[in-house]
């Protein structure tokens, strides 16, 4: 097999690959064995048609596509390895020659990983985040816990206020017609949560239980349902019930409800302080690591291919969908409640996606420049930690992980950032 790599402008190039005729014939043989299983010709049992009869009846060309499906993946992978390139996208393949008894010639236009010209990455000046825990921090955490332990109590009299939960029926109309997803009964809506279309919740304020009202709103221009985007809508709303939050008293009993390891409110405050101190310390360390990485990435010169940004945006979208599903939601519901569509969300994610790609390429280049590698001992230590965290035997964890490349890459990533932090100038 012969391989030629021609670099084009930017991060693109063309592989020209020639596969030996002998290998092509092997591919045709394999293709025939696959295809003939489903062939029935009078005088022969299904799957037992001789090759010569098959080719006479259908032509050898009938085998070409299946032969290509067999030959191309292996030939392309070998060509990439021989050329020493790192494609970042699916290649665009064109067949130049495919004929029985002759070599296979194809071209593959590919986008490759860009060259990284590192700027300054040692001696970077960064500030360490203040990790002091104040009395106010402790009080704020106490208030948050108080909110979490609040009870929703029905208001016997009174009107809807911000922070209340209103149990409502609603039905929406656009141009006088009801629309899909615009109707619900006994829906619990927290006023001020921003869950509904802008202006909807505000107009519930002041309503009483049993009261009915028509609410006028306008769907956002970027609303996910194009047929509703930018259109005025009328919602008929009925309030069934109003619930208000009743906060528990901040006393020793509350402290024991929150944490059965404490007896008094003061003990709870001490425990909160220690937890916040640990949290702030970790946040400060994470912020420091992020800062050195961000500066090193900013100093690097990289012509990032658009396809890498798109692929990272795809990954971010999948991660976001997974987080929504953990909350019992999905992307479709998110689009409905937020007024966004996929295109708007992708555009919103694009800048972060590009930063992620830039950082990953920079870290990889620094690791290479500084010969940062991961030892077997380090991998085994990491596996021990992971096994302990998941309450598994190391061998079982290895079996579940299969390939340990991900563990190795994660360790190399962390070691490279450790190197950047150790070689930075940290100001308090």
UniProtKB/Swiss-Prot annotation:
Family: Belongs to the FKBP-type PPIase family. Tig subfamily.
Gene Ontology CC, one term: cytoplasm
Protein name (database record): Trigger factor
Record-listed E.C. numbers: 5.2.1.8
Molecular function GO labels: peptidyl-prolyl cis-trans isomerase activity; protein folding chaperone; ribosome binding
InterPro entries: PPIase_dom_sf, PPIase_FKBP_dom, Trig_fac, Trigger_fac_C, Trigger_fac_C_sf, Trigger_fac_ribosome-bd_bac, Trigger_fac_ribosome-bd_sf, Trigger_fact/SurA_dom_sf
Organism: Geobacillus sp. (strain WCH70)
Record keywords: Cell cycle, Cell division, Chaperone, Cytoplasm, Isomerase, Rotamase
Signal peptide stretch: none
